[in-house]
From Swiss-Prot:
It catalyses: (R)-4'-phosphopantetheine + ATP + H(+) = 3'-dephospho-CoA + diphosphate. CDD domains: PPAT. HAMAP family: PPAT_bact. It is found in: Cytoplasm. Pathway: Cofactor biosynthesis; coenzyme A biosynthesis; CoA from (R)-pantothenate: step 4/5. It comes from the Bacteria. This is Phosphopantetheine adenylyltransferase. Belongs to the bacterial CoaD family. Coiled coil: none annotated. ATP binds at S9, Y10, H17, G90, L91, R92, E100, L124, E125, H126, I127, S128, S129, S130. One of its GO terms (cellular component) is cytoplasm. Its EC number is 2.7.7.3.
Amino acid sequence: MTIAVCPGSYDPVTAGHLDVIERSARFFDEVHVVVAVNAAKTPMFSDATRVDVIRRALDKAGCKNVTVSSTDGLITDYCKKVGATVIVKGLRQNGDYEAELGMALVNRKLAGIETLFLPADPILEHISSSIVKDVARHGGDVTGMVPDCVVPMLADALAEERQRKD
């Protein structure tokens, strides 16, 4: 059985993330989507919220061979724990490749785990979690950029953010 891990901060999960996860689920027997803590980022949503939203979106998509969890440790340690032999990452643009290649080489050195890069669907390659949050912060419509369940959640989080600033 081939097990893959799709790590990310998923803050929030986007249509592009889901596309990569769903495509991965067609190639591998089992896929683990892992909400990973990124010390360089301050998340808008808790780990538990991100896990829950991804689960709901994948249930709606009918992905049966996908597990969703979180970790604050090394992704390679998580891979070893679940028996994963590959990490799957989506690539949108050249900048993604440069950033992800270094991590892929470290993961190979640490644990012998290979990274498979899936190119983004051209229709979705402009979407990132940061862009989604920025568009929403400025009153733009993010429908179609994120799963339907994220739209009201994002609006609520931004309303709370505005209240804290006032």
